[in-house]
Amino acid sequence: MSNPSPQAPEEEASTSVCRPQSCSMASASRRHRRERRFRRYLSAGRLVRAQALLQRHPGLDVDAGQPPPLHRACARHDAPALCLLLRLGADPAHQDRHGDTALHAAARQGPDAYTDFFLPLLSRCPSAMGIKNKDGETPGQILGWGPPWDSAEEEEDEEVSKEREWRQKLQGELEDEWQEVIGRFEDDASRDTQEPESFSAWSERLAREHAQKQRQQLEAEGSCRPPRAEGSSHSWRQHEEEQRLFRERARAKEKELCESRARRAQEAQRDKGPEPPRAGPRAEHPRGAERGSLWRFGDVPWPCPGGGDPEAMAAALVARGPPLEEQGALKRYLRVQQVRWHPDRFLQRFRSQIETWELGRVMGAVTALSQALNRHAEALK
């Protein structure tokens, strides 16, 4: 007759080994069920219950699921769910099985989803603009913006390569200077510091430096090739006239902006009525004047006064450039305009100067103008 008592320790050891594994599996299963319940609440629009569930169980992953919750909210045009997910810590750079981020999903919804979905995601995670999916596309390429000019790779002759290197160096210095000036105005207490450089001053300085470089190149070419001196002088006179018209229009726009700001400040003061002066330095800066300093759609210095049709604005820019017979000069001129009106560059430089409720309309017009300029540049190849 066998004695079963020696097998008891082995059975107890086996049970003690299996028990932690079964507990961890049960815990993971409960977590997955709660995450599925969280996604069902979001799909049904029960946002209060979804938030309460996450507060009771803070260890849940709000990005779990395929597609992730942020992608689903963009596909369903569910703006409240998107805002709740961003507030709960969802990651806009999280990728699904196709490599798409939430910005890819928002860009595929078209222009209607730009303000309510694309801009909030871009503000939360600007670095996601550089993430490519498995097809090699970025969110900007899905919107039709195309890659920035300084990332394009194409074969060029020596003269065009030197021109591009100079422009990139100048752009980098301008961006650094612009960011340094804007950083002084992030705090409300530093209002008495120097004002940032206006768009007209920036464009005037850029045109002046570019004209100086063109003058030096023309002088060097004239000394080497005397028979073409007459044609070069004619092209230079035309370029000088274009730069003068551009500076006059920029100064007129700046004057119009100042008059508009002063008029809005006077109207706000007249509607408010006389008030006793308040002590302190902040009494000199009423809120009306602060709001009046932001651009509306008509305040942006468009190629045509007040904006208008993007094709017409692109045609106006091309008409101001060199004649079609001078293919090289016209291509260089169009590249400068492509850089100036590229949506990424425009948004990076002037977002803080535009009214928030006008930002979607302005960026839509800038995107359309950039695409029209790209088509003109492609037609010259």
Curated annotation (Swiss-Prot):
Q: Kindly list the positions at which Phosphoserine occurs in this protein.
A: S151
Compositionally skewed regions (Polar residues) per UniProt: 14-27
In the record, what terms sit under GO molecular function?
transcription regulator inhibitor activity
Q: What are the start and end residues of every segment in region (Disordered)?
A: 1-34, 132-167, 186-298
**Compartments where found:** Nucleus
Question: Which interval of the chain is the signal sequence?
Answer: none
Ranges occupied by ANK repeats:
64-93, 97-134
GO CC annotations on file = nucleoplasm; nucleus
The UniProt regions of compositional bias labelled Acidic residues, in chain numbering, are 151-160
Q: Does the keyword Transferase apply?
A: no
Q: Where is the composition biased (Basic and acidic residues)?
A: 205-218, 237-290
UniProt keyword annotations, A-Z: ANK repeat, Nucleus, Phosphoprotein, Repeat
Q: Which GO terms describe its biological process?
A: cellular response to lipopolysaccharide; negative regulation of canonical NF-kappaB signal transduction; negative regulation of lipopolysaccharide-mediated signaling pathway; negative regulation of NF-kappaB transcription factor activity; negative regulation of toll-like receptor signaling pathway; negative regulation of tumor necrosis factor production
Q: What tissue expression does the UniProt record report for this protein?
A: High expression found in heart muscle, liver, kidney and skin. Not detected in spleen, lung and brain.
- The main location is nucleus
What this protein is reported to do is described as: Involved in the regulation of innate immune response. Acts as negative regulator of Toll-like receptor and interferon-regulatory factor (IRF) signaling pathways. Contributes to the negative regulation of transcriptional activation of NF-kappa-B target genes in response to endogenous pro-inflammatory stimuli.
Quaternary context: Interacts with CACTIN (via N-terminal domain); the interaction occurs in a pro-inflammatory-independent manner.
> In its UniProt entry, what is this protein called?
NF-kappa-B inhibitor-like protein 1
Protein species of origin: Mus musculus (Mouse)
Biological classification of the source: Eukaryota, Metazoa, Chordata, Craniata, Vertebrata
- Gene name, Swiss-Prot/TrEMBL: Nfkbil1
